């Protein structure tokens, strides 16, 4: 079986959720797991090999090292310390995880890897920027998961509120993947119609405020109940991998290197992008209301401050 070769760095719940989702989509011919924890790495390889035996399209699963990455097409990085229970923010994770990401980036660069990297380690916008700076890879080939999951939560919440299918909802969360993210109401649509067609004009601001609070609380509530989030980001990231490896030119909300969009340069945060085998084919800039512009400016400031703290 010939096809793309996919590797993950970090075989925790997020990495293995991504890998299993990628396997069920039959995205690759070979899947390699890299992890500093040799015992966990091999255990996950065995478990996924058992799963693959029931479905020949799953591909081959192996344990590997950074030195083997040269001929791989796609890497998913989720390694790092996870958020602690009790309301720890993603940005509080920054200091330790920056050093972990620097180490990973150096090893991947040394391997000669020339494919696309998708990063989900938190705080993801800073981790993605760290990886890009250390590797010096082409910016279109370095992608953060950004507000991918936030946007999925927004679509789910809108669909649930108005009793519609989430497939018919077009709505985005942009900016930092964290507490300063910006839910875009001004351009949100269901089946091409603005939300005002589904809600009383007097209620829409209140209703959207409730939806916005739902998506902001969602991750913290999951972490408080089960310790971590992983199925949502794993599945959403596998979907991004599919759009890239199959060269679909479809739009997903990920974190590219900004080059002036929204007045932001040399930083990464969530915005809709066209995805292709190149990675980022095109960055799309959404038209914002004045309120949304102010909120995004605050999100950009938060990220700038944390880039300084990371000393990049």
Curated annotation (Swiss-Prot):
It is an enzyme of class 1 (oxidoreductase). Pathway: Fermentation; pyruvate fermentation to lactate; (S)-lactate from pyruvate: step 1/1. The active site is at 177 (proton acceptor). Its main location: cytoplasm. It comes from the Bacteria. One of its GO terms (molecular function) is L-lactate dehydrogenase activity. Its EC number is 1.1.1.27. GO terms for biological process: glycolytic process; lactate metabolic process; pyruvate metabolic process. NAD(+) binds at residues 14, 35, 66, 103, 120-122, 145. Keywords: Cytoplasm, NAD, Oxidoreductase, Phosphoprotein. Substrate binds at residues 83, 90, 122-125, 150-153, 229. SUPFAM superfamilies: LDH C-terminal domain-like, NAD(P)-binding Rossmann-fold domains. GO terms for cellular component: cytoplasm. The modification Phosphotyrosine is found at residue 220. It is found in: Cytoplasm. It catalyses: (S)-lactate + NAD(+) = pyruvate + NADH + H(+). Homotetramer. NCBIfam families: L-LDH-NAD. Belongs to the LDH/MDH superfamily. LDH family. This is L-lactate dehydrogenase. It comes from Mycoplasma genitalium (strain ATCC 33530 / DSM 19775 / NCTC 10195 / G37). The gene is ldh.
């Amino acid at each position: 079986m010939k096809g793309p070769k996919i590797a993950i760095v970090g075989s925790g719940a997020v990495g293995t959720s991504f890998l299993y989702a990628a396997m069920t989509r039959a995205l690759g011919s070979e899947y390699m797991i890299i992890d500093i924890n040799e015992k966990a790495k091999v255990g996950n390889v065995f478990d996924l090999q058992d799963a693959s035996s029931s479905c020949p399209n799953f591909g081959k699963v192996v344990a590997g090292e950074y030195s083997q990455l040269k001929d791989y097409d796609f890497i998913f990085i989720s390694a790092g310390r996870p958020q602690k229970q009790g309301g720890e923010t993603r940005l509080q994770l920054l200091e330790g995880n920056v050093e972990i990401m620097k180490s990973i980036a150096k090893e991947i660069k040394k391997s000669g890897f020339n494919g696309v990297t998708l990063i989900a380690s938190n705080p993801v916008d800073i981790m993605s920027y760290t990886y890009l700076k250390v590797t010096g890879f082409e910016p279109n080939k370095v992608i953060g998961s950004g507000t991918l999951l936030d946007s999925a939560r927004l679509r789910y919440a809108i669909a649930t509120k108005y009793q519609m299918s989430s497939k018919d909802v077009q709505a985005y969360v942009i900016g930092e993947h964290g507490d300063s993210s910006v839910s875009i109401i001004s351009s949100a649509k269901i089946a091409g119609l603005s939300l005002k067609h589904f809600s009383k004009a007097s209620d829409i601001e209140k209703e959207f405020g409730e939806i916005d609070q739902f998506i902001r609380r969602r991750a913290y509530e999951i972490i408080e109940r089960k310790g971590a989030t992983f199925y949502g980001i794993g599945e959403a990231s596998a979907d991004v991998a599919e759009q890239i490896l199959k060269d679909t030119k479809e739009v997903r909300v990920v974190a590219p290197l900004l080059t002036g969009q929204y007045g932001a340069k040399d930083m990464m945060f969530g915005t809709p992008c066209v995805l292709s085998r190149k990675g980022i084919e095109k960055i799309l800039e959404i038209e914002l209301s004045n309120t949304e512009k102010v909120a995004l400016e605050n999100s950009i400031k938060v990220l700038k401050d944390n880039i300084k703290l990371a000393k990049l």
